[in-house]
């Protein structure tokens, strides 16, 4: 479910900021080892690589990296959107958007230790859920049967410098191949700033979907 927030817990008169939200770990990318050319060496990467090789799974290293990276991106999206829905919160911070190599090793970034992209998500896609203005959707559960009706409640997080005048909203439902199954529009409206604002809701009967998606 995304139909929740922590506003009830934040009815206090001091600012509350979430500290080091997320921290999802990604499997090491052994292709980064040659980049460690200075006094800091990737000994930990070598330990992971040698262990994987000893267990006969070194050929799966990139699969582990890609799958854990994709899951991390989804989890960061979920965590950040929950922070944004909690409009009484004054802000949040991540441990870092790049891997942390001090005091041990924390591969929690969408960037590598050298601030290079890991190829997991583009800046544009990341800013769809982490930016001054973000479209949010509340829904009651994650898994549906085809005799269910999906209902989504749209919200706009807007901390941009100005309100959104005559904002137009369109929604659509796609299948696993990206084919649009249903689309529609919410009413054109003004959206304020410095807050989270309801933009309306829509429903879609799922009885036309005959296979898992």
Residue ranges and their predicted role:
Residues 2-166, 170-174, 181-183, 189, ...:
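Substrate-binding clefts and catalytic carboxylate motifs of secreted carbohydrate-active enzymes
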Residues 146, 211-212:
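Surface-exposed loops/turns
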Residues 150-156, 201-204, 213:
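Buried hydrophobic-core signal for structured, non-transmembrane domains
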Residues 167, 212-213:
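Exposed beta-strand face motif in extracellular beta-rich ectodomains
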Residues 180-211:
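Intrinsically disordered, low-complexity Pro/Gly/Ser/Thr-rich segments with frequent PxxP/GP/PP motifs
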């Amino acid at each position: 479910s995304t139909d929740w927030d922590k506003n009830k817990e934040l009815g206090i008169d001091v600012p509350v900021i979430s500290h080091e939200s997320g921290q999802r770990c990604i499997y090491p990318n052994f292709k980064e080892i040659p980049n460690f050319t200075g006094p800091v060496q990737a000994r930990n990467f070598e330990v992971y690589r040698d262990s994987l090789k000893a267990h006969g799974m070194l050929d799966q290293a990139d699969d582990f990296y890609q799958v854990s990276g994709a899951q991390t991106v989804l989890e960061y999206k979920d965590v950040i959107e929950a922070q944004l829905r909690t409009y009484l919160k004054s802000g949040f911070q991540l441990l870092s958007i790049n891997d942390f190599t001090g005091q041990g090793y924390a591969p929690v970034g969408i960037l590598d230790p050298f601030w290079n992209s890991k190829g997991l998500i583009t800046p544009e896609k990341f800013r769809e859920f982490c930016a001054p203005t973000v479209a949010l959707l509340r829904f009651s559960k994650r898994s549906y049967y085809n005799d269910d009706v999906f209902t989504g409640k749209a919200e706009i997080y807007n901390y941009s410098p100005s309100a959104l005048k005559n904002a137009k909203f369109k929604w659509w439902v796609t299948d696993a191949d990206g084919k649009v199954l249903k689309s529609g529009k919410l009413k054109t409206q003004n959206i304020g700033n410095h807050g989270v604002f309801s933009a309306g809701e829509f429903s879609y009967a799922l009885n036309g979907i005959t296979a898992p998606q």
